[in-house]
Amino acid sequence: MKAILNILLTGIIQLGVTHFVYAQSTLDNIHSTGIFRIGTEGAYAPFSYHDASGKLTGFDVEIGREIAQRMKAKPEFIEGKWDGLIGGLDAGRFDAVMNQIAITPEREKKYSFSLPYVISEAVLITQKDNNDIKTFSDLKGKKSAHTLTNNFAQIARHYGADIIGTNGFNQEVDLVSTGRADATINDKLSYLDYKKHRPDAPVKIVAADTRAAQTAVLLRKNDTELKTAVDKAITEIKADGTYQRIWDKYFAENN
């Protein structure tokens, strides 16, 4: 009986130690492996996408590389669809997610965020000839194109829109431009980049949410040491001019 009790106690202690290591040592794992695993979409220009040569690039990707460098690690970008990125963080496939993840009260209940590295606003996009939708309130009963779990879809639902599920921004705007969706709500910077590359696309902005959305690195709630390290890196990037250089590369024409 005593032997059985000792075995049980040993198992409980080992389980507790394993859980403690998993919950507390993400930064230690990054330091020991030299790899910072970042989940990203790879299909959301200009933040995370593939250039003409097939190389993964974008504003978020370049900021992620700089963060990793300042943590003395190599970034490993693991691509996936938007709807699976947060689940991938939960499952431990990534150490962080960088894909224009907006800070929201709902997400803050379960996750941790770094200091914000982008501040933008949500815009309502319709087909160029659409005169029925002029404000967010006009979305009631209309079809709005979104990835199902992002914060823009939540805004559209709030105004009574029927959601058409998509795989990302380009599909959303294409659905609007071809009339298969009435509208989409999305990030202003993404829209401006889209129009820069496709100036003849028959879409327009009809309204903007002036409450700026803050974008940050998404982390697990218990990764406090990693958050401190990422925040330190972001602060350094902004202080030494690196952030402004990357910003100007992607958004100078939009200023």
Where are these regions (language model features)?
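A ligand-binding cleft/hinge motif common to bilobed small-molecule-binding domains
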Residues: 87, 101-109, 155-158, 182-211
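Ligand-binding cleft/hinge of the Venus flytrap
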Residues: 48-52, 64-73, 136, 140, ...
